[in-house]
UniProtKB/Swiss-Prot annotation:
GO terms for cellular component: endoplasmic reticulum membrane. Belongs to the ROT1 family. It comes from the Eukaryota. Residues 236 are cytoplasmic. It is a single-pass type I membrane protein. This is Protein rot1. InterPro entries: Rot1 (IPR019623).
Length: 236
């Protein structure tokens, strides 16, 4: 019985190790324009950089670090020709659980969100963003059409995420340490974060989406992420 127990634990460890190995790299949706790393977020100037098309990207390292980049068009029911834009960036640590789920825990002070409504405002709201995330399962396979590695994630509620394709291995990421430390004296970041900025998100870009998923579903996704994101508005 003891031998059987040890063998079971060994097999579980092997499965988890191979699962982590399969995740390693940078994955992006089919537009291939949204990619984690310095092309999406500039930590020196503290700004998000607009890609030419919308999309999603995740990067994973073998030692448990991750980074994510989102650029989504959110449908506007009153003015369909004028969608809103949401850009998100986070990084932190992840863990693959024994049941195959993935738990992502971001560095709370580093996450950023940019919300833009180019048809109604000439400015966009740039805020700190902190949202833990969980995927119920993941699958890595060779895509039958593109003939490259493909990552399929399912959200915590089993909703399939848009498929992503391996674009870099090793992953393209920013440093995995805290990029925007908080001052212990004031409790504020060295650079205040809540501010209106000139909107970098254009209507043409938002209309040229990569057509991954139903816009109506992404509307509710955007509302959920904005409402539940633990956004901190830190004023100087």
């Amino acid at each position: 019985m003891i031998v059987g127990y040890l063998l079971l634990n060994f097999l579980v460890a092997v499965v988890r190790a191979s699962s982590v190995a399969e995740l390693v790299g940078t994955w992006t949706t089919k537009s291939r324009t949204v990619v984690t790393g310095p092309d999406f977020y500039d930590p020196i100037d503290d700004k998000l950089l607009e890609p030419s098309l919308t999309g999603i990207s995740y990067s994973f390292t073998a030692d448990g670090y991750y980074e994510q980049a989102y650029y989504r068009a959110v449908s506007n029911p009153t003015t369909p020709s004028c969608p809103k834009g949401i850009m998100l960036w986070q990084h932190g640590k992840y863990a693959v659980m024994p049941d195959g789920s993935i738990q992502l825990t971001p560095i709370a002070v580093d996450g950023r969100q940019l919300v833009s409504d180019p048809c109604s405002k000439e400015v966009a709201m740039y805020t700190r963003y902190n949202q833990t995330e969980a995927f119920s399962s993941f699958t890595v396979s060779i895509d039958s059409y593109h003939h490259v590695k493909r990552l399929d994630l399912k959200a915590f509620d089993e909703t399939p995420m848009p498929p992503m394709y391996l674009i870099f291995k090793p992953p393209q990421m920013l440093p995995t340490t805290t990029l925007n430390p908080v001052s212990s004296e004031t409790g504020k970041s060295k650079r205040h974060i809540a501010r209106d900025i000139g909107s970098p998100v254009g209507v043409d870009t938002l209309m040229r989406s990569d057509h991954i998923g139903d816009p109506g579903r992404w509307l509710w996704f955007g509302i959920f992420m904005t409402a539940m994101g633990g956004i901190a508005l830190i004023y100087s």
